[in-house]
Design a protein with these regions (language model features):
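N-terminal beta-loop-helix "entrance" segment that forms/cooperates
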Residues: 53-69, 168-173
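Glycine-rich phosphate/pyrophosphate-binding loop and the adjoining helix
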Residues: 15, 19, 150, 154-192
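Helix-loop-strand module that forms the ligand-binding subsite of alpha/beta enzymes
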Residues: 67-151
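Cysteine-centered motifs
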Residues: 5-6
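A generic structural motif
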Residues: 43-49, 153
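N-terminal beta1-alpha1 ligand-phosphate binding loop
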Residues: 16-45
């Protein structure tokens, strides 16, 4: 009788890369907490990266070329990701200004003034979620879906909106109900 031994090698390069984009700058952001919970749910089934776009300049065609270093870094991160997952609050029924600035940069052609070529977000799968007031970021997510679709991103139909209970605003702690956690798990499965 002979014994055959084999070794299984897991190649992490075949694992999907999901780029988290946090739409809040707040240190104790509920949306960062939501992203952290999503990261826990996904575990080792995908590679998670978080986009740092805090140094992105305001979009201005006067500084668009040569491409600013921060813009090149952000575009590269977007291009390398298999999917994007936005976690964002709602400001005045819409998305935060710094998130809009990021999306404006992503809508610009990578090749200067060549509007016939795809942008770095064309065809990119995008999931939308947010934690906020009683509207559960519905206005923000609807406007983001419209904008991202216009930008030719592939926006997932399933979204997640969390209406924070009043006490969360004084504790700065995001607590999910069983139903909300199940919805987050379902969205994570569709992103992976």
């Amino acid at each position: 009788m002979s014994l055959i031994c084999c070794r299984i090698v897991i190649n992490n390069s075949s694992m999907n890369t999901i780029l988290f984009i946090i739409g809040s700058l707040r240190a104790k952001s509920f949306n960062r907490q939501l992203a952290d919970k999503a990261r826990e749910i996904i575990g080792g089934r995908a590679q998670i990266k978080e986009l740092d776009y805090s140094d992105l300049p305001l979009l201005n065609q006067d500084v668009e070329q040569p491409e600013p270093v921060a813009v090149a870094r952000v575009r590269k991160a977007i291009q390398e990701a298999d999917a994007l997952w936005l976690f964002t609050p709602e400001y005045n029924g819409s998305y935060p200004g710094h998130l809009k600035n990021l999306l404006d940069w992503l809508s610009r052609p990578v090749k200067p003034m060549d509007y016939g070529t795809p942008t770095c977000i064309n065809g990119k799968r995008v999931a939308l979620s947010g934690a906020g007031g009683k509207a559960a970021t519905a206005g923000c997510r609807a406007k983001l879906a419209e904008l991202l679709t216009f930008m030719k991103a592939d926006v997932l139909p399933q979204q997640l909106g969390i209406a924070l209970p009043p006490e969360a605003w004084s504790t700065d702690v995001l607590t999910l109900t069983d139903e909300q956690l199940a919805q987050l798990k379902a969205l994570a499965e569709s992103v992976i």
